[in-house]
Amino acid sequence: ARDAMRVAGQIGFPVVLQVVSPDLPHKSDIGGVRLDLPSKSAVRNAYNSILKAVRARSSRISIAGSLVQQQLEGIEVILGATTDPQFGPVIVFGLGGIYVEALNDTVCRLIPITRQDAQSMVAEIKSAPLLNGFRGLARVDKRSIVTALSRLSTLVARFPDQLQELDINPMLVNAQGAVAVDAMALLTRSPSERKARDRRNRKSRHVGH
């Protein structure tokens, strides 16, 4: 908690605090994220509350630490990439944060994509009016989204055998640009790891017989 409080004081309030754990891809589902913390004491209380929530879920969850970020205003979007077994690498874009699964407002393209493809993806989601200043909301910098999509496509195309899945969720977008708030990457097993796993599987089947 002391380190989180110190970093928060250096960043400036308000801040966001979230748990860092390889076992928790969706931290907000268990109370692993606290927003709009106005002081060091609030950070300390949030830190203790997050730890309690994580331990209540399971004592086996690995906690690597905590992440302190400046509280920013904007619209949450998701950028992702995965490998379809039939079509290969696919890039995904849509409304992000907690609304991804609830609204299912996403579009996808096969990788690699052009900048024009990225522009089309941004325009095609049902929530596109939110990005254009809908009902008094500030118009966001859509060029920053297009750039992020293009760079993600380039990254996945460069390492198709190493990246199994990559999610940037949420990425916060406002009039000034875009900031990746949280991200998760799953790496493909190396050939040696796959062979070792296959040998273990064959051995366990043999022992079972």
Regions found by a protein language model. Name each.
Residues 1-209:
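ATP-dependent carboxylate/acyl-activation modules
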